[in-house]
Swiss-Prot record:
Binds 1 zinc ion per subunit. It is an enzyme of class 4 (lyase). PANTHER family: 3-OXO-TETRONATE 4-PHOSPHATE DECARBOXYLASE-RELATED, FUCULOSE PHOSPHATE ALDOLASE. The active site is at E118. This is Rhamnulose-1-phosphate aldolase. It comes from the Bacteria. Pathway: Carbohydrate degradation; L-rhamnose degradation; glycerone phosphate from L-rhamnose: step 3/3. Catalyzes the reversible cleavage of L-rhamnulose-1-phosphate to dihydroxyacetone phosphate (DHAP) and L-lactaldehyde.
Length: 283
């Protein structure tokens, strides 16, 4: 039986299409943004060209907890607008080594490339999310314009951000009933920001990086993309309200939240369902 080449797999196709959509939205300019997708051994071995280690690539993180797991990941310095045309150059299929401080390249990065510089942060978040849900496969980092803008105008509080976004549209609490996590501004590309993000990923599928972007998690590329889309739509509505003068005459209420929770049988974040007292500070 002739096996299909990995480049023609739905995983490569979907990754290329998703990253192009992120670029078209304006959320991943230049080489901004990165995505990783966990694949099973069976999914990988069903395709030709994935059975030999092409080279080993060191990583600055002990990922031994994920030893043997496969990830399709975008490359460092690569432009998402080029992924559809050059998938074998701009993404790679890697396997975490047993010792955890390197990865085996099984496919891709055919010009000598390496995984995104944020890959340690991805792996930390994959570890955190797998502990919450074994079906979680995707970590996505991008720069949604309106959500980033909100980090300049709203206190950097998970509760304040979540309630503000929930109030913008009824789909918000339905799609991210746990809310969104917010961390302080930190230098990107470091293990420190990865650790802080992973800690929030224990409770949230979306973590806001102030003045920068988001990390989001999901079961599939489509689901994770849709999660970011929904968060950004709420942020766009918030931005549009401010452009119209900022006066809000009516909006979704806490009772409306409760009605949505009941209607869609949601496990919402109870801590975020009531506003704080004036002057209160929360994470």
């Amino acid at each position: 039986m002739i096996m299909t080449d990995f480049i023609d797999s739905p995983y490569v196709r979907d990754m290329a299409q998703t990253t192009e959509n992120l670029y078209r939205h304006g959320w991943d300019e230049r080489n901004g943004g990165n995505v990783s997708l966990r694949l099973t051994k069976e999914e990988v071995e069903a395709y030709a060209g994935t059975d030999k280690v092409l080279r080993q690539i060191p990583i600055k993180f002990d990922a031994s907890e994920l030893a043997g797991k496969y990830y399709l990941v975008t490359g460092t310095g690569r432009y998402f607008k080029n992924m559809v045309e050059f998938p074998e150059r701009d993404m790679g299929l890697i396997r975490i080594s047993e010792v955890g401080n390197s990865v085996d390249l099984m496919w891709g990065f055919n010009d000598g490339g390496e995984p995104t510089s944020e890959f340690p942060s991805h792996l930390m978040s994959h570890i955190a999310r797998l502990k919450q849900d074994p079906d979680q496969r995707v970590i996505m980092h991008c720069h949604p314009t309106n959500l980033v803008a909100m980090t300049f105008t709203i206190p950097l509080s998970s509760k304040r951000f979540s309630r503000t976004l929930w109030k913008m549209h009824p789909e918000s609490i339905v799609v991210f009933p746990e809310g969104v996590g917010v961390i302080p501004y930190m230098c990107p590309g470091t293990n420190e920001i990865g650790e802080k993000t992973a800690a929030k990923m224990a409770d949230y599928r979306v973590v806001v990086w102030p003045h920068h972007g988001v990390f989001a998690a999901g079961d599939s590329l489509d689901e994770t993309y849709g999660l970011v889309e929904t968060v950004e739509k709420s942020a766009l509505i918030y931005t549009t309200i401010r452009e119209q003068g900022g006066e809000v005459l009516q909006s979704l209420t806490d009772k409306d939240f409760r009605d949505l929770i009941k209607r869609f049988d949601l496990k919402a974040n109870e801590d975020f369902l009531t506003p704080d007292a004036v002057g209160a500070t929360v994470d």
